[in-house]
């Protein structure tokens, strides 16, 4: 009994001691737009404690001994600011800071254990420095990712990363402000991702990671994921006109709708902002058969603060594009004089696509400083593409032109709850999340079936190879725990559970037949970060990822695929790397990686057939270097190697 009373007294004394600690809370704003800034690095100098601001520009330190502190705030494109703060017992010191824009300085980049899980130093730097003329080109900012266009500028680009031919997005998850770009069970191919509906001048930042080491990232993130963040507000209205050869011109305009009328909720803070932007492009290009390429984009965005700790963001956009393209031509066709180098075998190739989006995001900080995010999105998407890859191989009379067509509705929800706590010197960040997405083609809601047909000159349908309605659901729950065990060592563990239901109605059968396939998958994650000093950080990332298969594969093959788990083939991988900053103006990021992918069945959208893709193994090394030579001159280097191998196949 005496021992118990002694233990209880010690607990009460320790609790009392902790109760006399103080806290520090602050908010950071952009001087130009008067809007909060997310991702600002906030460090307490001398303590090696750091954090980053959230979506509301807020940060918080808890459990500080009563004393004066010097706080350093830094962010790319802004001048670093030092402030002095006095923390008192049992009180929370509040700070409001305004950052001013400044030329990009590599010296502003910090390596911190407090932001280990979301450090993307290379990407954040590149987006500030490189000129961008096309939204798809932004993907090149991801070191090791490159793109290729082979269908006239209107079709989504071909993507390649870490030994993957990603086709048009099969193994990379792309989002804009959290809204999905990839189209599952698409008429052209699984995961098709057309980013052309994003106006490049409105891109504020790019978040990315190779492999889905975050529990938040699920389907299609086998090789990696990229999220584009559009600007919350315009600092000024703008107009840009460009012109060039071959009847090429482009016009881009952005209009700040509220300006100073946005109201002031508090000093240095706008209550709301809104803008409208549009882009139009046209070119005939240099081919013998004019492209007649047209693209129109319109986007509007509203951002408002509902109270001091809540904001609402509404985004609407619409996109339309139409074009002709010359297609591929064989060398012998040029050598024989059948067509010129800039000619075409089938001059009727081309396409038309459109997309309309609505995105609503609601972010709030509770009285206990927990962060709640809610997002709902809706998209209406249309696609019609005419291609001819084999000319007259299949049909020597009419040719081999195909039409891939669909119109779909997609909608979904992303939600998360983030809470932070401290036990002794250990800091915990807990995230719980839920996601839902549904894609529907055909039906009674203005959508048309997913189609693959053989055609002639775009005008005549010769035969339908695939024609049916797709209804696909992906629901997921995830949990993520980030534990800062010390000022140097951080552990992140997470788990994700995904459920898929694929439904396909084959309209070529009489009567039409509907089939369904269901499957769930569990994806664990484990990441370790060790910061040797403010210049060196080591990390080990491990995870399981996956991508779903096309509904036209999993429904007909159904039960056999479910038993062998090939509806959702798993991908296991790891990264071992270092972020190194030997000098203020030099950053080096190097990593060795490994990836193993399970056997799967792949739907070939151009032929309407199913191909067996066996197990595979990939390994390689990534190296990225950024060096600032002068205030206005920068050097960058990306070296990436990949060694993909098929497992189990005979050599040759």
Spell out what each predicted region is:
Residues 29, 33, 41-45, 74-78, ...:
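Short, acidic, small-residue-rich periplasmic hinge/interaction motif at the N-terminus
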Residues 207-215, 224-259, 278, 575:
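Short strand-turn segments of transmembrane beta-barrel domains in outer membranes
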Residues 307, 426-431, 435-437, 468-597, ...:
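Structural signature of Gram-negative outer-membrane beta-barrels, strongest in the C-terminal barrel
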Residues 62, 179-210, 228-229, 300:
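Short acidic/polar hinge/loop motifs at secondary-structure boundaries
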Residues 305-320, 351-507, 586-592, 636:
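Face-selective signature of the C-terminal outer-membrane beta-barrel domain
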Residues 417-418, 591-596, 612-652:
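Gram-negative outer-membrane beta-barrel transporters
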Residues 245-282, 287-326, 350-370, 424:
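Transmembrane beta-barrel wall of Gram-negative outer-membrane proteins
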Residues 136-183:
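Extracytoplasmic beta-strand/coil segments of soluble accessory domains associated
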């Amino acid at each position: 009994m005496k021992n118990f009373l002694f233990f209880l007294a010690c607990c009460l004394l320790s609790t009392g001691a902790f109760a006399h600690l103080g806290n520090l809370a602050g908010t950071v704003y952009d001087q130009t737009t008067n809007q909060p800034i997310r991702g600002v690095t906030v460090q307490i100098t001398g303590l090696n404690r750091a954090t980053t601001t959230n979506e509301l520009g807020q940060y918080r330190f808890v459990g500080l001994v009563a004393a004066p502190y010097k706080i350093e705030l830094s962010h790319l494109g802004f001048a670093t600011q030092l402030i002095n703060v006095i923390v008192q017992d049992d009180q929370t010191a509040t700070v409001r800071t305004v950052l001013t824009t400044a030329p990009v300085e590599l010296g502003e980049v910090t390596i911190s254990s407090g932001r280990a899980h979301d450090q993307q130093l290379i990407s954040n730097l590149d987006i500030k420095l490189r000129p961008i003329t096309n939204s798809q080109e932004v993907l090149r900012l991801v070191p090791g990712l490159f793109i290729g266009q082979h269908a006239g500028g209107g079709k989504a680009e071909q993507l390649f990363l870490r030994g993957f031919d990603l086709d048009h997005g099969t193994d990379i998850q792309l989002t804009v402000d959290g809204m999905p770009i990839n189209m599952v069970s698409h008429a052209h191919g699984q995961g098709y991702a057309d980013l052309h509906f994003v106006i490049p001048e409105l891109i504020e930042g790019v978040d990315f990671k190779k492999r889905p080491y975050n529990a938040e990232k699920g389907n299609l993130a086998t090789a990696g994921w990229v999220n584009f963040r559009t600007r919350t507000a315009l600092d000024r209205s703008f107009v840009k006109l460009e012109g060039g050869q071959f009847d090429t011109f482009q016009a881009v305009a952005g209009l700040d709708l509220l300006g100073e009328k946005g109201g002031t909720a508090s000093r240095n803070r706008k209550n709301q902002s809104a803008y409208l932007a549009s882009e139009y492009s046209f070119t005939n290009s240099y081919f013998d058969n004019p492209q007649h390429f047209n693209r129109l984009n319109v986007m509007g965005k509203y951002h408002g603060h509902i109270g001091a700790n809540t904001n609402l963001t509404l985004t609407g956009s619409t996109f339309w594009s139409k074009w002709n393209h010359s297609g591929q031509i064989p060398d012998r066709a040029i050598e024989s004089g059948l067509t010129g180098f800039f000619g075409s075998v089938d001059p009727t190739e081309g396409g038309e696509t459109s997309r309309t989006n609505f995105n609503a995001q609601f972010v709030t900080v509770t009285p206990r400083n927990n962060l709640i995010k809610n997002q709902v999105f809706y998209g209406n998407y249309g696609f019609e593409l005419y291609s001819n890859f084999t000319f007259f191989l299949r049909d020597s009379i009419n040719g081999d032109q195909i039409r891939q067509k669909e119109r779909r509705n997609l909608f979904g929800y992303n939600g998360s709850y983030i809470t932070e706590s401290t036990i002794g010197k250990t800091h915990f960040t807990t995230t719980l999340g839920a996601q839902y997405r549904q894609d529907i083609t055909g039906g009674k809601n203005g959508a048309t079936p997913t189609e693959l047909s053989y055609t002639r000159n775009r005008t005549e349908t010769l035969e339908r190879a695939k024609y049916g309605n797709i209804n696909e659901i992906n629901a997921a729950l995830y949990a993520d725990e980030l534990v800062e065990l010390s000022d140097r060592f951080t552990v992140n563990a997470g788990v994700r559970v995904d459920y898929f239901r694929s439904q396909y109605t084959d309209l070529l059968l009489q009567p039409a037949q509907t089939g369904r396939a269901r499957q769930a998958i569990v994806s664990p994650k484990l990441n370790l970060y060790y910061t040797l000093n403010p210049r060196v950080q080591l990390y080990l990332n491990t995870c399981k990822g996956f991508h779903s298969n096309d509904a036209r594969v999993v429904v007909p093959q159904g039960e056999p695929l479910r038993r062998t788990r090939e509806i959702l083939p798993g991908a296991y991988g790891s990264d071992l790397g270092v972020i190194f900053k030997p000098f203020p103006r030099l950053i080096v990021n190097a990593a060795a990686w490994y990836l193993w992918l399970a056997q799967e069945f792949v739907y070939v959208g151009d032929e309407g057939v199913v191909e067996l893709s066996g197990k595979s193994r990939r390994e390689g090394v990534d190296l990225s270097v950024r060096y600032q030579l002068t205030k206005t001159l920068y050097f960058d280097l990306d070296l990436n190697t990949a060694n993909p191998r098929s497992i189990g196949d005979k050599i040759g």
